[in-house]
């Protein structure tokens, strides 16, 4: 027989969005923001410890607006950028009214914009006085974050803990104070802890430097 599809919701009206911006200045600032993201990548590559980040270049850097929407990115790993904004918005949602200058957050939760657990995201707000203007964020593939097997994320996992350490909304830097001991505790205090927390910490330091 025939399958008949009947629309029950009105088709959304699509209107072209105009702009009064100077196209020259728009392009200038577009390239300025992209250049910042590229410089973030150079810093991350040059200061990271792991081969994954330093040589394989398995990372991405980007700039987001105060609401977590993507403004500009460098041509790193496009697969990271599709969901990184959700990670920024998760940080905003979970810390509403509590984010301050000098703070940075870490997460790899796939339920909040993460990809697989080895991809760890560091999110840092950019303030002017008391107002958040932007967020800068970078995501890097750490060689190991625990799990049943070295390298993390084994395909036969039946539960998220078997893939590695799940990090959600952890404040890595609190008003300029780097919380290394607490971060090590997160990496080690798990059913399947990270096998080389020292390397994880070194790469997280590089991500902070990039931001």
Question: What residue spans do the PLM features occupy?
Answer:
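Gly-rich Lys/Arg/Thr-decorated short loops/hinges at beta-loop-alpha junctions or inter-strand turns
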Residues: 13-24, 69-72, 192-195
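Residue-level structural signal for beta-strand termini and adjacent loop
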Residues: 9, 76, 138-139
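Short, Lys/Arg- and Gly-enriched loop/turn segments at beta-strand edges
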Residues: 12-16, 113-119, 145-146
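Cysteine/selenocysteine-centered motifs that mediate thiol-based redox chemistry or coordinate metal-sulfur cofactors
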Residues: 31-34, 38-45, 99-122, 126, ...
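Alpha/propeptide regions of enzymes that mature by internal proteolysis
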Residues: 28-50, 57-117, 131-135, 199-201, ...
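Mobile "lid/hinge" segments at catalytic clefts and subdomain interfaces of large enzymes
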Residues: 129-211
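Core beta-strand residues in small-molecule sensory/regulatory alpha/beta domains
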Residues: 64-65, 123-127, 139
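Terminal amphipathic helices with adjacent charged low-complexity linkers/tails
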Residues: 1-18
